[in-house]
Design a protein with these regions (language model features):
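Extended beta-strand/beta-hairpin segments
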Residues: 1-50, 57-140
Length: 140
């Protein structure tokens, strides 16, 4: 099933404004300040973070279920770091921090399955050009 997102930018880079939609229920506005100066509003990197956290959580849950250890819950926080490199904005790091409630599994197995999910979720694969993607995984 194709997924669709739409964005429109009006005006110059530093003074303009943008809007985006994704699916039926996600939408917002963004500006230069919300993207590069931690100002109010959304930015594309937040959407990447949410997409990565969601995809990773589902991939980890599926892997654990296939291994015979159904999940009560998996929560993942993703932090996308955007920095200027040689004067151009570059996503330099994505940090995934995941916690799971998985009865009947030990920490080492959970971490192993989390590493597999990080390598194999479709969004991780799409972000393969990011220089560093880190993972912290623990059981609750």
């Amino acid at each position: 099933m194709p997924a669709k997102g739409t964005a429109e930018w009006k005006g110059g880079l530093q003074t303009g404004t943008g809007t985006f939609t994704a699916g039926d229920s996600i939408g917002g506005g963004f500006t230069f300040k919300s993207r590069f100066e931690d100002g109010p509003g959304s930015n594309p990197e937040q959407l990447i973070a949410a997409a990565h956290a969601a995809c990773f959580s589902m991939a980890l849950s599926a892997a654990l279920e296939r291994a015979g250890t159904p999940v009560e819950s998996v929560q993942t926080d993703a932090t996308v770091t955007l920095r200027l490199v040689d004067g151009a904005p570059v996503i330099t790091n994505i940090a995934l921090v995941t916690q799971g409630r998985v009865p009947g599994i030990d920490e080492a197995t959970f971490v192993k399955e989390a590493e597999g999910a990080k390598a194999n979720c479709p969004v991780s694969k799409a972000l393969a050009g990011v220089p560093e993607i880190t993972l912290e995984a623990s059981l609750l």
